[in-house]
Amino acid sequence: MKKLALLGSTGSIGTQALDVVRCIQKEGEHAVKVEALAAHSNIRLLEEQIREFKPQAVAVFALEAASKLRAAVRDLDVKVYSGMEGLCALTELESVDIVLNSVVGMVGLKPTLTALEAKKQMAIANKETLVAGGSLVMKTAKENGIEILPVDSEHSAIFQCLQGMYKKCDLNKIILTASGGPFFGKKAGELQHIRPADALKHPNWDMGAKVTIDSSTLMNKGLEFIEAKWLFDMEPDDIDVVVHRESIVHSLIEYKDHSVIAQLGVPDMRIPIQYALTYPRRFPSPVKQLNLADWQKLTFYAPDEETFTCFGACKRAIRRGGTLPAAVNGANEAAVALFLKEKISWQDIGELVCHVADTFETAPVTSVEDVLEADRKARAYVLERCGESAR
């Protein structure tokens, strides 16, 4: 039985992960037990989860919300931690042996490193951790003998396709698929008056707001491009991206003999979540089966980098390397937050991200502080450029 610490339990990935645990337990299997839960501030849902799954400990990032939760669950035998220290404390619990990090943003970096240093099996859905601190994360994982299990559908697909590979030198390239988001096929002139509500209408996937906006700008695929470089130790030139509107083929690998292997399934995040939690075993899933006869055709297109400029910015950032991916990620997080508040336009996101990718200096990443400082400077630039104060 794997004993799970779930960071980000009230978010999109977190709630789906708990659906997976329910399904596995309903099937009579006891492969996963929820040992710890963490959330940012949604203590109403977190309390419900605590009463259902009975974890040993929980953490709330927002300090005031943590105090309220302590009062709400004083009748239960559960320890309530708070802040960044609380998130990290959960990953070090002796009773925990696997951590699923599904928090959104740079806040996920320190808990990931702490979990790896504690030699916990690590399932990562927090792509910003690898984008900003990929060299640190992979170095720490290697030093502690930990294999990182990807939860993003595309990276899970690549991970599954690689099972049974004889030698890494047999691999020619990996091919990530992108849905294209809600604005596929549109040009820049058609995207001048996009509102948050428009960008939040994803055609295939049920995701949180930030990730859905990133999908609409193709920033999500740029982040996944960087993530793939670190997860699979690939050069940027050996990673391709194709737009696949149906979201049935989740990603592919090509071998030296030009044979191609793909992972297919209906677009449901519970498949990659479950595989990460139960790896290397597989269990019955709550997800419906894929019936290929229902699909008359599957389509593939080259991404439009001229219109969706964030994607190219990410590729340029990882080629320059160092702290620049952290800066680009920080700029995007700040810009998306402003867009969701309708303080800037949808197209402003790409302009801000590209400016950081093309003009910011880069430096070697030697510590968490290097990553956090690059992130801070990029966020400060975005806020200053948009007339906002850092708060």
Regions found by a protein language model. Give the residues of each.
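Catalytic, metal-anchored helix/loop core of enzyme active sites in primary metabolism
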Residues: 1-391
